[in-house]
Amino acid sequence: MSKQTLVLLYGGRSAEREVSVLSAESVMRAVNYDKFLVKTYFITQMGQFIKTQQFSEKPSESERLMTNETIELTQKIKPSDIYEEGAVVFPVLHGPMGEDGSIQGFLEVLRMPYIGTNVMSSSIAMDKITTKRVLESIGIPQVAYTVYIDGQDLEACLVETLARLTFPIFVKPANMGSSVGISKAQTKVELRKAIQLALTYDSRVLIEQGVVAREIEVGLLGNDKVKSTLPGEVIKDVDFYDYQAKYVDNKITMAIPADVDQSIVTEMRSYAEVAFKALGGCGLSRCDFFLTQDGQVYLNELNTMPGFTQWSMYPLLWENMGLAYPDLIEELVTLAQEIFDQRESHLI
């Protein structure tokens, strides 16, 4: 039986490229090599596509994907050279130019099936401000927030924010993930600095009310019919779950399933599925919630390309539901082909 080609795209132009490499390495080890041939392409910070490795069997534990330190620019290709008839692309890319609709649009132009959500839902979910406004419109609870757009009157924004929110306040670039560029402010001076930091990553800044809450996450899988997981909890031993804590210091543990009341589980899974459909989601997403001590649920964000490292919540949530990592990848490939066929049928 001939193997299907799975094209892994990793690296990318955003500040989350290191997470992308970790995720892609976990995927390449989890693939069922009885069914798939894996071809990998590294995208540099400048947007160059580099042809790297090919795997017909599971790589050794010591083998690593090629990155900036090991690639050769002689392997640079035209982006369109990744095209291969019958192949499915797994764009294991995080952040801007990865999960914001850009690469998804490129792959649709190439007429290649790809894992993950489509152009529209990727771009909406990537922007935290737009996501909040969409979810508010369908009655899904959000924590209080204000918005600052680069070029607006910063002093007026500070006045509005301090009138509506109380410290602590979290400041986030609208279009970044993995906690990149996020700050916690306890004073007006810190708030101003936090906005300036966020502006180095994006021109749109979300300013959000800090809440004392547990962080609960739900996995989503499907196209027209979406399935959700039991929730898992991120248990922190740091005050703020930032990039350093997530990926460098590993100062987190996870409780899967989360220890929450059944009524809360039902509410979160319902909100997650409704939000996924409202944003036009397909393939997969991870839905992140805040759960306060008095039982209030807030939907924080939808992550359309969650981390796929061996310690990432998304694959572990599905493993808890009885879907092992290799089978999850296979299901994602099937969903990618299904949505591709549907999209193509609408163009004829």
UniProtKB/Swiss-Prot annotation:
<dbReference type="GO" id="GO:0005524">
    <property type="term" value="F:ATP binding"/>
</dbReference>
<keyword id="KW-0963">Cytoplasm</keyword>
<dbReference type="InterPro" id="IPR013815">
    <property type="entry name" value="ATP_grasp_subdomain_1"/>
</dbReference>
<keyword id="KW-0961">Cell wall biogenesis/degradation</keyword>
<keyword id="KW-0479">Metal-binding</keyword>
<dbReference type="InterPro" id="IPR000291">
    <property type="entry name" value="D-Ala_lig_Van_CS"/>
</dbReference>
<dbReference type="GO" id="GO:0009252">
    <property type="term" value="P:peptidoglycan biosynthetic process"/>
</dbReference>
<protein>
    <recommendedName>
        <fullName>D-alanine--D-alanine ligase</fullName>
        <ecNumber>6.3.2.4</ecNumber>
    </recommendedName>
</protein>
<dbReference type="InterPro" id="IPR016185">
    <property type="entry name" value="PreATP-grasp_dom_sf"/>
</dbReference>
<feature type="binding site">
    <location>
        <position position="303"/>
    </location>
    <ligand>
        <name>Mg(2+) 2</name>
    </ligand>
</feature>
<keyword id="KW-0547">Nucleotide-binding</keyword>
<feature type="binding site">
    <location>
        <position position="301"/>
    </location>
    <ligand>
        <name>Mg(2+) 2</name>
    </ligand>
</feature>
<feature type="binding site">
    <location>
        <position position="288"/>
    </location>
    <ligand>
        <name>Mg(2+) 1</name>
    </ligand>
</feature>
<feature type="binding site">
    <location>
        <position position="301"/>
    </location>
    <ligand>
        <name>Mg(2+) 1</name>
    </ligand>
</feature>
<dbReference type="GO" id="GO:0046872">
    <property type="term" value="F:metal ion binding"/>
</dbReference>
<keyword id="KW-0436">Ligase</keyword>
<dbReference type="GO" id="GO:0008716">
    <property type="term" value="F:D-alanine-D-alanine ligase activity"/>
</dbReference>
<dbReference type="GO" id="GO:0008360">
    <property type="term" value="P:regulation of cell shape"/>
</dbReference>
<comment type="pathway">
    <text>Cell wall biogenesis; peptidoglycan biosynthesis.</text>
</comment>
<feature type="binding site">
    <location>
        <begin position="162"/>
        <end position="217"/>
    </location>
    <ligand>
        <name>ATP</name>
    </ligand>
</feature>
<keyword id="KW-0573">Peptidoglycan synthesis</keyword>
<dbReference type="InterPro" id="IPR011127">
    <property type="entry name" value="Dala_Dala_lig_N"/>
</dbReference>
<keyword id="KW-0133">Cell shape</keyword>
<dbReference type="InterPro" id="IPR005905">
    <property type="entry name" value="D_ala_D_ala"/>
</dbReference>
<dbReference type="GO" id="GO:0005829">
    <property type="term" value="C:cytosol"/>
</dbReference>
<keyword id="KW-0067">ATP-binding</keyword>
<keyword id="KW-0464">Manganese</keyword>
<dbReference type="InterPro" id="IPR011095">
    <property type="entry name" value="Dala_Dala_lig_C"/>
</dbReference>
<dbReference type="InterPro" id="IPR011761">
    <property type="entry name" value="ATP-grasp"/>
</dbReference>
<feature type="domain" description="ATP-grasp">
    <location>
        <begin position="132"/>
        <end position="334"/>
    </location>
</feature>
<dbReference type="GO" id="GO:0071555">
    <property type="term" value="P:cell wall organization"/>
</dbReference>
<comment type="function">
    <text>Cell wall formation.</text>
</comment>
<comment type="similarity">
    <text>Belongs to the D-alanine--D-alanine ligase family.</text>
</comment>
<dbReference type="Pfam" id="PF01820">
    <property type="entry name" value="Dala_Dala_lig_N"/>
</dbReference>
<keyword id="KW-0460">Magnesium</keyword>
<dbReference type="Pfam" id="PF07478">
    <property type="entry name" value="Dala_Dala_lig_C"/>
</dbReference>
